[in-house]
Amino acid sequence: MTILDDILVKTRQVIARDQASVPAAELVAAAKDLPVCRDFHGSLAATDQVRLIAEVKRASPSAGLIREDFDPPTIAKSYEDGGAACISVLTDEPFFQGSLDYLRQVRSAVDLPILRKDFIVDPYQLLQARVAGADAVLLIAECLSPQQLIEMDEQASELGLQTLIELYEPENLAPVLATKTRLVGINNRDLRTFETDLQHCVRLAADIPSDRLVVGESGIRTAADVAMLKAGGIKAILVGESLMRQPDITIATKALLAS
């Protein structure tokens, strides 16, 4: 069993637990009175500069605990002050020590568009995201069949949520492009082994049509990395761990975007 297989087993257990606590019907009712979502794609497409999705991330399977003084609202505000265009909040509990409560806290702290980053395999998680205050959700091609990708993208749109659809394997690019998403994420980390290669997204970006905005994910640490990705056609980046480890997140965010 790969790491990803294990993650998906645990994810389905968490979904079952949550559904027993809060039925989908309650979330559907709660979602009806919510304000319109912020424009996640628009925030990333606003300028020709590489735009940053800054991630609120407590831990990971590969790195363990990333930051001791973990206060999601403070971290998100630091990202906003540093020039981030959007915020990503990791909500996976078993492997990343995340929580939907963190997303709710961040929503109350900043006005930037927010992404729920999790291993989304069930429409129930889309409802959770919308009610918690997310404006967009991450879908992962390696976690869903081509038909499921299309259906989940459509269901997210019906809730007013935008999607960032991520892939690692080149053969998953066609299924991603078969959806209506405008945001295609290329993960430099193989979710099966957790090894990273920063050039991976540059190689795949060449095959993505210009009407899709490409987001580079994982392994991005320096302004030089950002400059290299920009030269390779990457329009936005998602960065978490390297910023979360810095003593002053605002200064680190500004430095990363200085390219």
From Swiss-Prot:
Keyword Magnesium on entry: no
SUPFAM superfamilies: Ribulose-phoshate binding barrel
Signal peptide: none
Reactions that this protein is recorded to catalyse: 1-(2-carboxyphenylamino)-1-deoxy-D-ribulose 5-phosphate + H(+) = (1S,2R)-1-C-(indol-3-yl)glycerol 3-phosphate + CO2 + H2O
A Pfam family it matches: IGPS
One biological process term in Gene Ontology: L-tryptophan biosynthetic process
InterPro entries per the UniProt record, alphabetical: Aldolase_TIM, Indole-3-glycerol_P_synth, Indole-3-glycerol_P_synth_dom, Indole-3-GlycerolPSynthase_CS, RibuloseP-bd_barrel
Enzyme class: lyase
Keywords: Amino-acid biosynthesis, Aromatic amino acid biosynthesis, Decarboxylase, Lyase, Tryptophan biosynthesis
Enzyme Commission code: 4.1.1.48
GO molecular function: indole-3-glycerol-phosphate synthase activity; phosphoribosylanthranilate isomerase activity
Pathway membership: Amino-acid biosynthesis; L-tryptophan biosynthesis; L-tryptophan from chorismate: step 4/5
Family per similarity comment: Belongs to the TrpC family.
Full protein name: Indole-3-glycerol phosphate synthase
Native source species: Rhodopirellula baltica (strain DSM 10527 / NCIMB 13988 / SH1)
Chain's gene name: trpC
